[in-house]
Amino acid sequence: MDIKLKDFEGPLDLLLHLVSKYKMDIYDVPITEVIEQYLAYVSTLQAMRLEVTGEYMVMASQLMLIKSRKLLPKVAEVTDLEDDLEQDLLSQIEEYRKFKLLGEHLEAKHQERAQYYSKAPRELMYEDAELVHDKTTIDLFLAFSNILAKKKEEFAQNHTTILRDEYKIEDMMIIVKESLTGRDQLRLQDLFKEAQNVQEVITLFLATLELIKTQELILVQEESFGDIYLMEKKEESQVAQS
């Protein structure tokens, strides 16, 4: 069972999303935290053997340079270069934000004008099932990036052997649903507590994505950087009875 992921429009689109979660001026965000989230996100995609295009890797190398500069002793010349690199990055994100807002405004105007013209009905085209990167799904990936990093560290400390067992997404979907039996919701990180190796962690996550795609599960996150909870999607009849 394959799960395809649509990319962001580019690395700046991903960075803008990460920055916007802080709900403050772009130039005031903790840039080191943003860099770590970006690198963790890309690392997770690679661990899941999903394609990461070259432009994301180029940006990753630039971000690692900025991060490494911040770890160096505070020498005047180095500090100036570090500030230049950081300000240049933030300026790129700010410029991208403005262009994106302009694009959204123009698209809204286009849709408004389109309402004045009748259009012939178009045949609906269905592609292979894809999980689109909406904001909630992006936050899910970011949360999983942190979980995967912590589990890798845990396995390393416990000298856990990486087994070559073939975990099936279909089997893991059953496990995910069973984990919700008798409870209203499940905190995302609690789903992976009993996982024995990285492959099991990743397959559990893919199973979760599949259940979200098939609308058997929904995500709840009440605030930026808050815990993400999984909930079974109730049928309308169940909602009416509750």
Swiss-Prot record:
Single GO biological process annotation from the record: cell division
Cellular component GO terms, alphabetical: cytoplasm
Keywords assigned: Cell cycle, Cell division, Chromosome partition, Cytoplasm
Stored InterPro entries: ScpA, ScpA-like_C
Main location: cytoplasm
Coiled coil start-end: none
Recorded superkingdom: Bacteria
Intracellular or extracellular location(s): Cytoplasm
Signal peptide interval: none
Function (record text): Participates in chromosomal partition during cell division. May act via the formation of a condensin-like complex containing Smc and ScpB that pull DNA away from mid-cell into both cell halves.
NCBIfam families xrefs: PRK00104.1-2 (NF000993)
Subunit structure: Component of a cohesin-like complex composed of ScpA, ScpB and the Smc homodimer, in which ScpA and ScpB bind to the head domain of Smc. The presence of the three proteins is required for the association of the complex with DNA.
Protein name in the entry: Segregation and condensation protein A
Organism of provenance: Streptococcus mitis
Name of the gene this protein is made from: scpA
